[in-house]
A protein has these predicted regions:
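Flexible "arm" and connector segments at domain edges
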Residues: 1-109
Length: 109
């Protein structure tokens, strides 16, 4: 699916269900992502690693579950941004926050 098809599909789904339904679904998907991340924390083989991808790629089921949940959350976020008409504003805010964090990192080094 190309980007245009993806966006058209997001719009169709968002318009069908509406903000109330999809905002509640987003909350559910975020909770599922939280649970998946927590499961990975409990796996001892990943303790004290900054980059878990050092360990055999995506072969662990906990990582695969996180990938699935990230996809669900991103799909729902795309719908919410469309429904609220705030995609551009979110991108601006992300850029601002990234630059601010890089400044903080630079000051601490």
């Amino acid at each position: 699916m190309n980007q245009e098809e993806y966006q058209n599909n997001i719009i169709a789904i968002a318009n069908h269900y509406g903000y109330d339904s999809q905002s509640r679904q987003l909350i559910e998907e975020m909770a599922e992502l939280t649970v998946a991340i927590n499961k990975l924390w409990r796996v001892e083989r990943f303790c004290d690693r900054k980059n878990i991808m050092d360990v055999n790629g995506f072969s662990y089921p906990e990582v695969k579950e996180i990938i699935e949940e990230i996809a669900d959350v991103e799909i729902m976020l795309s719908q919410i941004k469309y429904l609220l008409g705030c995609k551009y504003e979110v991108e601006q805010e992300k850029e601002r926050k990234i630059l601010r964090q890089l400044e903080r990192i630079e000051k601490n080094e």
